[in-house]
Each structure stands twice: as C-alpha cells, then as structure tokens.
Amino acid sequence: MLKIYPTSLQRILLLTALLLGMKPSYAQNIEEVLAFRKKKPLKISGSISARTTLFSSQPSEARQSFTCQLTGSVNLSLYELLNIPLSFNLNNYGANFSYPSLPNRLSLHPSYKWMKAHIGDVSMSFGPYTLNGHQFTGLGVELSPGRWQVSAMAGRLLKRVDADPNIPSLQVGYERWGYGLKTRYEGSAFALGGTVFAARDRDGRISFDIDALGIYPKGNIALGIEGSLSLIKDLKLSLEYGLSRMQQDLRSTEVSYYHALRADVSYSFLGNTLGVGYERIDPGYATLGAYYFNNDYENLTLNYSRSLFDSKLSLALSGGLQRDDLMGQKLEHNKRFVGSVQVGFTPSEALSASVSLSSFQSYRNLKSSFDYINARTPYDNLDTLQFTQLSHSLDADISWRLKQSEAQTQTLSATLSYQEAADRQGRYIQPGQLSRFMNLGTSYSLDLSVLDLTLTGGFNVSNNYADRKAVLTLGPSLSLAKRFLKKQLSTGLSLSYNETQETGHRLAQVYNLRATAGYRFWGKHGLNASVAYQERKLRHAVSSPRSSFTSELSYSYSF
C-alpha cells in the first residue's frame, strides 16, 4: 500500500475541520482533530493482473487461438473519508466482432460518507420490474442521507451494431439510451419507495432495412412502487408493483401497457418462520432495463423454516401453485404444483450433511388451433387432451473429516444428484417421455502439513436415461499439490480419465492432464502458469483422436 503525505493539503483539511467543529464541544473537537491528523492523507491500494492464453487443437476448432486480458482495481482513499475505487477489464475477446455491450470495461466508483457514484461501464438495479442489472456506459449515483435512499442513472444501454455483409449472422441493433431515478424512505415500522425508468432507441444513421429484418426501434417507460409495513413485532408485509409502457415501434403510435405485482407476508414466532407470497406478471411484460423477463404467470407460495437442536439441524419447506396463460390466448394451458424440502445437519465440526428434495407436477391442456376455428359454443373444447408433466430431483452431500492432527488431515466427501422427468397422459407415462439423470461423486483428500503436500483422489459416475437409451459415463481422477520455498511456490498436477458407454458399448474416451505452478515473491507479486492437454477418442470418428492443448500465463501485483 502506498502512503503519501502532502503537508499543505493536510493543514488545509485540519483547519477546515477545526473551524467547522468548534461549536458543540471544544474538547470533543480537539480529540476529533487529533484523530483526524493521525490518518494518512492519501492511501493507494489495489491489484492489477495480466493474463495470456494460447489454444491449439487437432483438428482445428473455431476458437480464438490467442487471448489476452488486463484487469485491475485501484482504490484511492483521502483521510479515510473519500474513497475512489477504479476498476477495469480490457481484453481481445472476439476482436473481429462488434458487440452491443462492450466486453472491455472501465469503471470508477468514488464514495464519500453517504454518497457514491458510478462512472464508466457500470450496472445498477432499481427493482425487478424496472432497471435490473443492465450494463450501461454513463453515470450513476447512490445517496443515503439518514433514512432516505436516492439512486439515479443516465447512459448508453446498447451500442449501435451496423450490418456487415461478411458476417450475415451478426445481430444488428440500435443505439439505446436510458435514464432512471429511484427514491426510498426507510421508517422504523414502514418503508416506501418509487422508481421511474425510461429508455429509447436512436434510429438515426442505421445501416440496415428495418422492415426487411423486423428489428424496430423501441421506447419504454417503466414505473415501480414498493413498500413494506411491520404491523406487530416479527410480522412484516411487503408489496411491489410495476407498470411498463412499451412502444415496440417508435414509428407507430401504438403503445402497450403491462402490469406486475408481488406481495409477501412473513411471521416469526418461537423459532419458526412462516411466509406466504403471491406474484403475478402480465403476458408480454418487459422493460428495456433488463436482459430477460419471465412473464405470463401467477404464483402462490408457502414457506416454512426452523432450526432445531441448537441450530445443528435446519429445516426449510416450501410449496406453491403456478399457472400461466393468464389471458387464455395460448394453445397450451399449464398449472404447476411445486414443493421442496431442504434439511441441513451438522452434529459436529467434523461431520456435516445436507439433503434437498424438490418435486413439481405440471398440468397441461393441449388444444389444436382447429379446435378454436371450428368451435361453435364455449363448451366445445372441454374435452381437449390433458397431460401431466412430472419432475423430481434430489441433491445430497456429506463431508466427514476422518482425522485431524498437526501432521495430517484426512477428509472423505460424497455428493449425489438425481433428477427424473416424465410426461403422463391419464395414468400412463407416454412412450419415450421418461428421462432420468444421476450423478455420484466421491473424493478422498489427504493433507500432509509437515510435507506441504496434498493428495486427492476421486471417482465420478453419471447415468443418463432418455429416449429409452441409457448412457453411462464414469472415470477416476487424481490430483497432487506440493508447496516449496516456505510455501511461496505452489505446484499441482492432475490426471483424469472418463469413458462413455451405451448398452455396454464404449462410445468415447477422454484423457485430461493438467499442470500448474504459482510463485509469490517480494510479498506482493504473483506469477502463475498452467498447461492442459486433452485427448478425445470417439467410437464413430473417421479421423484420428481429437486433441487440444491450452497454456496460460498470468502475472499479478497487489499494493
């Protein structure tokens, strides 16, 4: 960490602090000034790293053979009051392509007390129904004076992507700008907030035919209202509402309005927590402040959780109903029941286990479009086909520390995942519509502290049943890690083999070999290197076995 002492700046700040703090208490202000004087005027801390990767394969693959990346984060602190963090990510990924969102990013995040700014290539979230994590290039601020919270942003959401005749698959697009404001007040027993977000495409200087490609300039205004209320102790109600005004084509006057609503109630009593949630999102709900939206569904959920035996055993239950086709306009209408159970057990520091179960049933009514065309009365389609989709999953893991001493530590662990899905009509599973997936992994680790050596062995088995065929993949893995030079030099070597079988016949074999090395020197510098080789042998391959070689070199410096 770098330390700088600009005496003139220090004297000015000390004098200002003294003049501003004379009134309440002279002795108190003298102590504050003395404490302030002990602080370093300027501290610079952070890290920077550079990485290069070389890739080659036989036969050649459509993958970039050389990539490089420069990343870093730097923080400037003035008297431990004003913080100015700077982060950047520069690379040559896809150097020959144009992106609506740039892979290279440079951002600055200065903060002072309850004020914080975001400058450059950043992202912010106001709520799930307005601005939700969309990257933009511009300026954002977050203010939190007292019980108030104020956030604002303005910037370019998407960069214009022009048509390129040499790349017909390139997704062209408009330059898109967005602006947003969110305010929220947190009271002792309630909270209330509101959000407004607007975005609009700029359709000038485009290089493609709008009507031919069907890519139209869009405009959007999204409003959000949120609030929470605590009626009594441990009882909390929360509500969030979103309204999206979407214009799919700015050249037209047609505008669509969509609504979204979410409400939750939770109550804690005698170590129990009980909650009820409801959410409804209109078909077609979307905003230009998020990359993806789930819509056209209605959820009703019930949750329960409790800890037992001095928190050694935790239990969480949830269940709910979901339906879609809220407007009755789809050919398929789905109703779904979802339930899950999560259990965690930690009887001692050496043993821990967890189990998670989930199950849902989806009821689906299929209707031919001719059923609508030929319908004469509202009752004609009551006997349409009814299907039930079943899905069950199980996840379990256990970790057992067999032995722990100053000389060695032995650990045994295992994980199990199982998933089953099927389509049922009436009481019968449809032919070819049953699938099962199971994965089992075990590992044993031996850490010899005296030798700075760690050995790990494992075995994995996966079984995938679908389309009346069972595919089995299994194989062992072995890794070794050794530290030298008082743990400054770390080395590693790993080997793995797996093969895929179908009805007893071998389909593929995969060999992996990887070596790594990392060296820390002068306390703040790090140098890392790795090489990896993979070979694939396919049963029906015409050519020789496929192989690939990847090497990586990186350097890091922290200060």
Which residue ranges define each predicted feature?
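Bacterial N-terminal signal peptides that target proteins for export
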Residues: 2-13
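Bacterial N-terminal signal peptides
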Residues: 13-21
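Sec/Tat signal peptide C-region and signal peptidase I cleavage site
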Residues: 23-27
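Transmembrane beta-strand segments of Gram-negative outer membrane beta-barrel proteins
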Residues: 30-59, 64-66, 80-86, 110, ...
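Exposed, low-structure sequence patches enriched in small/polar residues
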Residues: 65-71, 101-103, 198, 202, ...
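Transmembrane beta-barrel wall of Gram-negative outer-membrane proteins
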Residues: 71-76, 139-153, 176-197, 220-236
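Outer membrane beta-barrel
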Residues: 88-157, 273-274, 279-284
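Hydrophobic, small-residue-rich alpha-helical packing segments that form membrane-like cores
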Residues: 154, 159, 163, 167-211, ...
